[in-house]
Amino acid sequence: MPERAARLRPDAHAAVSNNKDFNDMKGHAVWASMVPTAVLLAGWSELASAATFDGARLSALWGLPFAGMLLSIAVFPLIAPAFWHHHFGKISAAWALALLGPFALWFGIDLALAKLVHAMLDEYIPFIVLLTALYTVAGGICVRGNLHGTPRLNTAILALGTLLASVMGTTGAAMLLIRPLLRANDNRRHVVHVVVFFIFLVANVGGSLSPLGDPPLFLGFLEGVSFFWTTKHLALPMLFVSGVLLAAFYALDSYYFHQREEERSRFFDPTPDSSFGGIDGKINFVFLAAVVALVLMSGLWRPQIAFDVFGTQVALQNAVRDVALIGVTLLSLASTPRAARAANDFNWAPIQEVAKLFAGIFVTIVPVITMLRAGESGAFAGLVHLVNDSSGHPRDIMYFWATGLLSSFLDNAPTYLVFFNLAGGDAQTLMTTGATTLAAISAGAVFMGANTYIGNAPNFMVKAIAQSRGVPMPSFFAYLGWSGAVLLPLFIVTGWLFF
């Protein structure tokens, strides 16, 4: 017993030390979130020129909370993962308050409340309700059986997931297939590349053909882009990128399997191969069809009825869609056998993280979008000049790369909104005379969300599930090496061919 106690003492000291570091980090984060507020107040005379909330007169300082929010998402999980895990919701709220406080002081509480309600009702709630519905429905579909992870099977699963991603969302398709894929390959030593290409294809590229596929495209749908517009205009770029990636994956997986693992796979298998055992929770396929129908309904049904909520016009079709999606979510939870969700290790942590972080993003992005709508008259005139030529015409290739690179390191949903508005923000114009520009923005946001773990919400969710199953996933920068070697050359060719 004394020896055991002695062994525990260093751990106890370490725990005290770690707790001190944790509290120090918490204090630093609180102070960091106050910096933009202090800067905004310090620049009060400059901000005073924007009392009417005119995008052409707003100072770029109003974009600091948005920048801080996105930098927190990028940096905190790397430098303080434990702190981030416990406090990401508080950090998101702090950045939102860092904007709303000065905003209410200068523009008035009424306008601050109106902008907050608009951000929540017009964009955030529809966005998170759809994601939650897809996540819940997909989490209730359990594929039974342990297949043998050969290159042919793995490629087939990736191809299937790529197609499903535009129907049930990248989140839904990823959550449906990642666990069967990991079980099929748990007898192999080299599995990292399987998960990396799964993120490339299923969690990102595959979601480019419909508003259901990826959050940026759903935001575009909310802005007025028709449901099947992306299906028509992104089909060729998507087929090209996914075809090249599937061929590259098959070649790499064949090398690992036949040269290094074929013998091992015969003798070591934690989950012995078995035939396809059927699907539990089949009722969720009905719910999935209902989700698709509801989104289509909200885009096609125009009753010209709206409700005024603190100045925000909530269209009847959108209210019906969101309430019905909540109903579908509850029905899925009530009717799915518990065993099916248990077999999928279903839990709410991933969607809770997305909900808390995007609440802060949608609040802090309000002044940024207002300034971008001002075009050359606003604070971001330099960005306008980068993506447009001297005569004001868009450089489509620059829209593709600018949207894509920012989507890689920030988040592709708000980045899409930024460049959508930078291109004019009018869906009807962009779908017609500006079709190539809108296609470049859409492809950049969806495709290049695969460049990093933080580019798209499902990326981190897939990484976490793989790590929980014992896969030694690459670090942030190691994953960046994978995407730099595989995706960057492919995107250079894609931009040259299509934009």
Task: State what each model feature region is.
Residues 62-73, 87-103, 124-133, 159, ...:
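Hydrophobic mid-bilayer segments of alpha-helices in multi-pass membrane transport proteins
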Residues 209-210, 229-273, 447-499:
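Juxtamembrane and boundary regions of transmembrane helices in multi-pass small-molecule transporters
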